[in-house]
């Protein structure tokens, strides 16, 4: 992320060097942080590469998340309270790419932000809102897996009403955080190569810097700690279960107890937890660079280049592509329904054999009720 070489001004206008900030239209010049005046415009090649990558990622994300929403809402066996979190995740990922990638591609074609100050703020707000909702949807999924696997029968079953209330809280709080920069706590500004907008992480006053810090605590650190807590206890529960199974098998003088129905149910729950853990791990690796960029900006600890900042933004948006792929490859019941409804898109071996599908469906529905 740090720039290893100082910028070299290769672009000239009226006999003087042209900076990156001077490439934007006059109507949004006041929104550009002075930091960007030290950089020349990017080579046109980079706009083409970034636009192409975003277009591919956006198309894949829109198609993949639409399919996830369709499969989970159209299949009765998948319409469970727990899977409402999955559908919400797919919806927020879909909306993030729906609102993010067309402007980046369009502005990349012109080499700068051409959509005016209002749409810049709207773009930044949508990115903040849908990114926050996606992160907290994955947090709810992780905590739900914790309740199912660790607490087991001792837990209070999740109802549809409880799931809806949790999602309403997430949308309300994330919406409030996304709106705050529009009312004076920080602001949304052009960033990187000037084809996208985000929070102002180069603000010099601590009032605006505090927004980045507090927001990151809500949208990054708190979810991360919740996820670590959930999966730490899940791994402990799985290890304890495996140890108990081995000891019981030794007492019964048999090789394995894997044929028991209780163990089949536990295996399904563990597989679903692995799917969620994979999804969340991908989110962590996608959003961590962008978080580092924000902190590097407010604490002035790195000399950030336009290319590094826009790549961090693109990397974060790429997470919206990963989730439908993970569920398509790993979620047993999802794969089964996808194979039935869209056989041309099904991939991999069906984890549920014809003799066990009815039982597995009941187990999944029952465990997520």
Swiss-Prot record:
GO CC, any one term: plasma membrane
Q: Which residues lie on this side of the membrane: Extracellular?
A: 1-46, 110-123, 187-210, 299-305
Residue ranges of the TM segments: 47-71, 84-109, 124-143, 163-186, 211-238, 275-298, 306-330
One Gene Ontology MF term: G protein-coupled photoreceptor activity
> What InterPro entries does the annotation carry?
GPCR_opsins (IPR050125), GPCR_Rhodpsn (IPR000276), GPCR_Rhodpsn_7TM (IPR017452), Opsin (IPR001760), Opsin_RH1/RH2 (IPR001735), Retinal_BS (IPR027430)
* Record-level GO BP terms: cellular response to light stimulus; entrainment of circadian clock by photoperiod; G protein-coupled receptor signaling pathway; negative regulation of transcription by RNA polymerase II; phototransduction; sensory perception of sound; thermotaxis; visual perception
Posttranslational mods? Phosphorylated on some or all of the serine and threonine residues present in the C-terminal region.
Where in the cell?
Answer: Membrane
Which residues point to the Cytoplasmic side?
72-83, 144-162, 239-274, 331-369
Principal location listed in the UniProt entry: membrane
Residues listed as glycosylation sites in the UniProt record? 17, 193, 208
**Entry keyword set:** Chromophore, Disulfide bond, G-protein coupled receptor, Glycoprotein, Membrane, Phosphoprotein, Photoreceptor protein, Receptor, Retinal protein, Sensory transduction, Transducer, Transmembrane, Transmembrane helix, Vision
- N6-(retinylidene)lysine, modified sites: 317
* Tissue-specificity statement: Each Drosophila eye is composed of 800 facets or ommatidia. Each ommatidium contains 8 photoreceptor cells (R1-R8), the R1 to R6 cells are outer cells, while R7 and R8 are inner cells. Rh6 is expressed in a subset of R8 cells, most likely expressed in the subset of R8 cells paired with Rh4-expressing R7 cells (R7y).
- In terms of superkingdom, the source organism counts as Eukaryota
What are the cysteine partners in each disulfide bond? 120-197
Q: How does it sit in the membrane?
A: Multi-pass membrane protein
User: Does this UniProt record's set of keywords contain Cell inner membrane?
Assistant: no
Q: Which family does it belong to?
A: Belongs to the G-protein coupled receptor 1 family. Opsin subfamily.
Q: Which PANTHER family match?
A: OPSIN (PTHR24240)
Primary role = Visual pigments are the light-absorbing molecules that mediate vision. They consist of an apoprotein, opsin, covalently linked to cis-retinal.
Quote the protein name from its UniProt record: Opsin Rh6
Q: Which gene encodes it?
A: Rh6
């Amino acid at each position: 992320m740090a720039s290893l070489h100082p910028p070299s001004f290769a672009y000239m206008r009226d006999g003087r060097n042209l900076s990156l900030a001077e490439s934007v239209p006059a109507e949004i010049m006041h929104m550009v942080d002075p930091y960007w005046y030290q950089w020349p415009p990017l080579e046109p090649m980079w706009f083409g590469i970034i636009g192409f990558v975003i277009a591919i990622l956006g198309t894949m994300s829109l198609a993949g998340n639409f399919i996830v929403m369709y499969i989970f809402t159209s299949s009765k066996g998948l319409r469970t309270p727990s899977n409402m979190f999955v559908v919400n995740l797919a919806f927020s990922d879909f909306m993030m790419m729906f609102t993010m990638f067309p402007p980046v591609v369009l502005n990349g074609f012109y080499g700068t932000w051409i959509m005016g100050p209002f749409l810049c703020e709207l773009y930044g707000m949508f990115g903040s809102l849908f990114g926050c909702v996606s992160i907290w949807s994955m947090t709810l999924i992780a905590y739900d897996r914790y309740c199912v696997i660790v607490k087991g029968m001792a837990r209070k079953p999740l109802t549809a009403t409880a799931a809806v209330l949790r999602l309403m809280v997430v949308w309300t709080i994330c919406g409030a955080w996304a709106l705050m920069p529009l009312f004076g706590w920080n602001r949304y500004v052009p960033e990187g190569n000037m084809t996208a907008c985000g929070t102002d992480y180069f603000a010099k006053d601590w009032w605006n810097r505090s927004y980045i810090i507090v927001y990151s605590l809500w949208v990054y650190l708190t979810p991360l700690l919740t996820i670590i807590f959930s999966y730490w206890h899940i791994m402990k529960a799985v290890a304890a279960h495996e140890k108990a199974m081995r000891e019981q098998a030794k007492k019964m003088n048999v090789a394995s107890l894997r044929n028991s129905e209780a163990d089949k149910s536990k295996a399904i729950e563990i597989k679903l937890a692995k799917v969620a853990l994979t999804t969340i791990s991908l989110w962590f690796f996608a959003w961590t660079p962008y978080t580092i960029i924000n902190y590097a900006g407010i604490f002035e600890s790195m000399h950030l280049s336009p290319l590094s900042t826009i790549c961090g933004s693109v990397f974060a948006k790429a997470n919206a592509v990963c989730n439908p792929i993970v569920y398509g490859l790993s979620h047993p019941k999802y794969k089964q329904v996808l194979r039935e409804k869209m056989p041309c898109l099904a991939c991999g071996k069906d984890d549920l054999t014809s003799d066990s599908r009815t039982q597995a469906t009941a187990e999944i529905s029952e465990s997520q009720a």
